[in-house]
């Protein structure tokens, strides 16, 4: 617990605490920035109240005495125009003193910083505050002072209070109204926010944002009635406020006589609790009876999202196993979608309408972590625990059905091109993670993939469409992986494939490497990387082509040996290429090793296994283009004098250039730059002796070579 200043006030001990720095910044942002949608504060506070009620109801399943202090589970709203306060009361689990200090001020939630950064960058809206775990502080959108009175079964009643001036107080409450159990949040509204004391406004807000909360939400309403009474009955009627109307209806004769007496009108003010949310759980109703607006309202109350959902799947499974479920796909991915420290809490699990938990990892796989919704089972035991969940066969069947229905929903989204573009932009990584992890559904998920290609232009293509465009005689699906579309679309690896008119898919998402490693084939056709060795094209069966290839190999055999000797263990072998048309050379990786892109990804892993990296990334093959002028000139020089210093320099320069064009990174960019500078000096006829001492492993190009080979010849 944080350190505090302690003083006595009215016999009760009051402690003052400082807000944690990030929370102080957040409060300052909320208070000093103008937001048009301040109304979301009520949704956030009701949502928190609902969570507290969920907790006590779950605790009561194992020990009924937990609800003895307040058996009824409710949320109450009390507007008080006289004091300009709005109170939100719940009979939930309540908070201990330690909870109050930690949860409301001294320990920042993981999302505090992210929320402020997203707000400042304009990437999110203040109404998303609940998704970042700091919804309580939205109270300061409408209030300049907030008081939280709370009672937990394991502690005394305490009052938390703050005007958001950098600190808050916590007082042991012995004199105030005793709650029994639960929390009462009192908002002292700003003068320009008094609309939130109006019954109509509060009813509208609950219907808009919190209609489908599982607990009754009551509003303390004021009713003014005007009635006529005779003078001599005024006193008697005042005593019988509740019975008066009944007596008048029952006795018509008496009413006729009363007309002769003098009447007078009086106003009667009465108060009563009115339940605002009377809808039964939406998942119990038939899908055809529910409007899109009702689904949207339920989705927003379930998730605290401010946008409508992108898609919904409402279904029930009947037979040996029975459960009902509603699943939603949001319009955008949450900021912490792949945060491994965060527990999945997007699917709420109910058993016979009783909320059990919302972070049941066994209910849905990690790759579907973005799907939100509810599952209500009649077959699971009410007292199910996390330990028994893992072995529960019913849950495994539910999980299998949820995955199946999610995939169906994704295909339904794919029927609308614009909607699917939004979906794919937000959640394509999840689909690819599913391909990597879910072997049973891998083939189905492959149909959801979309890629740019050498023939798709600005559009993307599916694997299915790619297959329909395959050239006659083409046996495989070709792809290239890389850092970006720009980095791969002019890659030397594509030269021969483009010349033959074969389409190549651009896989430029880091996770594509993992997905394609598992997918391996589609529709009976192998997925073949354009950057790995062993690329076979259909004309290799042509006898004449084979003969030409053998002749070229023989002619460049000596140069291949020279290059291998110069490069040593930097490459595994040097061969004549069949895949490049214009470029002088390229570097390919082994069929089962990492691609250049995968090597880049693995180097970026902070906790990578260095020994594995060395093993997987060392197998490079240099392929040289026998039709390229540079290679032909290099062959002549090597044959004339294999110890020619210019040959070594040119080979090293070609190797380092090939590293870059093939998607690898340079281990020593300074040496590469120095080599380029020396080639420039050579081309410009700058005397080498005037330059600084050269690096030992980069011998200067001799004068004979300099005269023989100007830069334009090398080009």
From Swiss-Prot:
Residues 243-253 have a biased composition (Acidic residues). Pfam families: HATPase_c_3, HSP90. GO terms for cellular component: cytosol; perinuclear region of cytoplasm; plasma membrane; protein-containing complex. InterPro entries: HATPase_C_sf, Heat_shock_protein_90_CS, HSP90_C, Hsp90_fam, Hsp90_N, Ribosomal_Su5_D2-typ_SF. Its main location: cytoplasm. A motif (TPR repeat-binding) lies at residues 711-715. Keywords: ATP-binding, Chaperone, Cytoplasm, Nucleotide-binding, Stress response. It is found in: Cytoplasm. Gene3D superfamilies: 3.30.230.80, 3.40.50.11260, Heat shock protein 90, C-terminal domain, Histidine kinase-like ATPase, C-terminal domain. The keyword Chaperone applies. ATP binds at residues 48, 90, 136, 386. Residues 226-262, 693-715 are annotated as: Disordered. Homodimer. Belongs to the heat shock protein 90 family. The TPR repeat-binding motif mediates interaction with TPR repeat-containing proteins. Molecular chaperone that promotes the maturation, structural maintenance and proper regulation of specific target proteins involved for instance in cell cycle control and signal transduction. Undergoes a functional cycle that is linked to its ATPase activity. This cycle probably induces conformational changes in the client proteins, thereby causing their activation. Interacts dynamically with various co-chaperones that modulate its substrate recognition, ATPase cycle and chaperone function. This is Heat shock protein 82. It comes from Zea mays.
């Amino acid at each position: 617990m944080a350190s505090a200043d302690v003083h006595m006030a009215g016999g009760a001990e009051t402690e003052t605490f400082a807000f944690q720095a990030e929370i102080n910044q957040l409060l300052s942002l909320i208070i000093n920035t103008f937001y048009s949608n301040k109304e979301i504060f009520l949704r956030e506070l009701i949502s928190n109240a609902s969570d507290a009620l969920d907790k006590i109801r779950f605790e009561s399943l194992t020990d009924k005495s937990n609800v003895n202090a307040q058996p009824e589970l409710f949320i109450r709203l009390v507007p008080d125009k006289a004091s300009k306060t709005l109170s939100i009361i719940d009979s939930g689990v309540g908070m201990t003193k330690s909870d109050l200090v930690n949860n409301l001020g001294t320990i920042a939630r993981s999302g505090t910083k992210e929320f402020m950064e997203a707000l400042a960058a304009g990437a999110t809206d203040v109404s998303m505050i609940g998704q970042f775990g700091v919804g309580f502080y939205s109270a300061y959108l409408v209030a300049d002072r907030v008081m939280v009175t709370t009672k937990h079964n394991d502690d005394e009643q305490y009052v938390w209070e703050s005007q958001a001036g950098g600190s808050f107080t916590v007082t042991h409450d012995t004199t105030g109204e005793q709650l029994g159990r639960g929390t009462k949040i009192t908002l002292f509204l700003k003068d320009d926010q008094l609309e939130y004391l109006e019954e109509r406004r509060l009813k509208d807000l609950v219907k808009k944002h919190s209609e489908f909360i599982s607990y009754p939400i009551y509003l303390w309403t004021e009713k003014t009635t005007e009635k006529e009474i005779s003078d001599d009955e005024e006193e008697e009627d005042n005593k019988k406020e509740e019975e008066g109307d009944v007596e008048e209806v029952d006795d018509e004769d008496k009413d006729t006589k009363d007309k002769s007496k003098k009447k007078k009108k009086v106003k009667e003010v009465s108060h009563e609790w009115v339940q605002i949310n009377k809808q039964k759980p939406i998942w119990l109703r038939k899908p055809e009876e529910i409007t899109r607006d009702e689904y949207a309202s339920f989705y927003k109350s379930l998730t605290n999202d401010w946008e409508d959902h992108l898609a919904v799947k409402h279904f029930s499974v009947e037979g040996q196993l029975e459960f009902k479920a509603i699943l939603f796909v949001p319009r955008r991915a949450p900021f912490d979608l792949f945060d491994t420290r965060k527990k999945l809490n997007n699917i709420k699990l109910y058993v016979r309408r009783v909320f059990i938990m919302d972070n049941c990892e066994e209910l849905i796989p990690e790759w579907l972590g973005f799907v939100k919704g509810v599952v209500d089972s009649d077959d699971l035991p009410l007292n199910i625990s996390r330990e028994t969940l893992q072995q529960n066969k019913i849950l495994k069947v539910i999980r299998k059905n949820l995955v199946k229905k999610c995939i169906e929903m994704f295909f339904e989204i794919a029927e609308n091109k614009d909607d699917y573009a939004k979906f794919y932009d937000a959640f394509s990584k999840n689909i690819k993670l599913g391909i990597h992890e879910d072997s049973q559904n891998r083939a189905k998920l492959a149909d959801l993939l979309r890629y740019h290609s050498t023939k798709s232009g600005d559009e993307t293509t599916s694997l299915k469409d790619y297959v329909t465009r395959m050239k006659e005689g083409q046996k495989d699906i070709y792809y290239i992986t890389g850092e970006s579309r720009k980095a791969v679309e002019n890659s030397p690896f594509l030269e021969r494939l483009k010349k033959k008119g074969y389409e190549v898919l651009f896989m430029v998402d880091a996770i594509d490497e993992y997905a394609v490693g598992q997918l391996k084939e589609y529709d009976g056709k192998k997925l073949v990387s354009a950057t790995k060795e062993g690329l076979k094209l259909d004309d290799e069966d042509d006898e004449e082509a084979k003969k030409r290839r053998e002749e070229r190999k023989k002619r460049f055999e000596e140069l291949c040996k020279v290059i291998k000797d110069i490069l040593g263990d930097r490459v595994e072998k040097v061969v004549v290429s069949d895949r490049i048309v214009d470029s002088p050379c390229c570097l390919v990786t082994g069929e089962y090793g990492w691609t250049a892109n995968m090597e880049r990804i693995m180097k970026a892993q902070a906790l990578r296994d260095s020994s594995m990296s060395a093993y997987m990334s060392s197998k490079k093959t240099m392929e040289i283009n026998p039709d390229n002028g540079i290679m032909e000139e290099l062959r002549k020089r090597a044959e004339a004098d294999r110890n020619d210093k210019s040959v070594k320099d040119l080979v090293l320069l070609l190797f380092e250039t090939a590293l870059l064009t093939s998607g690898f990174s340079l281990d020593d960019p300074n040496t590469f730059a120095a080599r380029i500078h020396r080639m420039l000096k050579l081309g410009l006829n700058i005397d080498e002796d005037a330059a600084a001492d050269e690096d030992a492993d980069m011998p200067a190009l001799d004068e004979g070579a300099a005269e023989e080979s100007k830069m334009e010849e090398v080009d």
